[in-house]
């Protein structure tokens, strides 16, 4: 009798989990329970609409957006605050291109429109070993001409 009850309860449990998963219960619960932040909602909106960094839609999205409190305090745009990788790339770009070559805004615009410039990342050997070898230097920026 006990074995029969345990089999019934086990089959009942399996039946309910299949019904619950069919309704998407777990996906809905995870999205609603975690209380996403404004930043997460913006990132999700961009991902859902296939809006990539550097596209006109990306720029328009952040231009139309009211600046967040953190953006006002830090002086950085919400686009840079939302995507740390973009922030790092902009910093490296400014360090490696604008400051190093002392470009005017017109020259910088010309370079951005006509060339693809790498950020000049540090080498893996420079990042990993402790202490850092003295002979390791940053990679030079790689400039490729875009064929228009």
UniProtKB/Swiss-Prot annotation:
EC code: 7.1.1.9
Record-level Gene Ontology MF annotations: cytochrome-c oxidase activity
Gene Ontology cellular component terms for the protein in this record: mitochondrial inner membrane
Cellular compartment(s): Mitochondrion inner membrane
Coiled coil ranges: none
Superkingdom of source: Eukaryota
Transit peptide boundaries: 1-24
Keyword Chloroplast: no
Keyword Transit peptide: yes
Catalysed reactions, semicolon-separated: 4 Fe(II)-[cytochrome c] + O2 + 8 H(+)(in) = 4 Fe(III)-[cytochrome c] + 2 H2O + 4 H(+)(out)
Alphabetic keyword roster: Membrane, Mitochondrion, Mitochondrion inner membrane, Transit peptide, Translocase
Main location: mitochondrion
Function, in words: This protein is one of the nuclear-coded polypeptide chains of cytochrome c oxidase, the terminal oxidase in mitochondrial electron transport.
Assembly behavior: Slime mold cytochrome c oxidase consists of at least seven different polypeptides species, subunits I, II, III, IV, V, VI, and VIIe/s in order of MW.
Name of the protein this chain belongs to: Cytochrome c oxidase subunit 4, mitochondrial
Organism from which the protein derives: Dictyostelium discoideum (Social amoeba)
């Amino acid at each position: 009798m006990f074995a029969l009850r345990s089999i019934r309860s086990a089959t009942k449990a399996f039946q309910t989990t299949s019904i619950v998963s069919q309704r998407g219960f777990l996906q809905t619960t995870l999205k609603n329970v975690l209380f996403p932040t404004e930043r997460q909602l913006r990132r999700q909106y961009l991902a859902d609409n296939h809006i990539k960094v550097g596209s006109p839609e990306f720029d328009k999205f952040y231009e139309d957006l009211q600046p967040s409190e953190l953006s006002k305090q830090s002086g950085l745009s919400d686009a840079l605050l939302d995507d740390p990788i973009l922030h790092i790339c902009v910093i490296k770009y400014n360090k490696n291109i604008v400051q190093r070559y002392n470009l005017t805004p017109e020259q910088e615009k010309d370079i951005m429109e006509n060339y693809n410039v790498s950020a000049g990342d540090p080498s893996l050997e420079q990042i990993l070993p402790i202490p850092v070898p003295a002979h390791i230097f940053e990679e030079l920026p790689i400039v490729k001409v875009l064929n228009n």
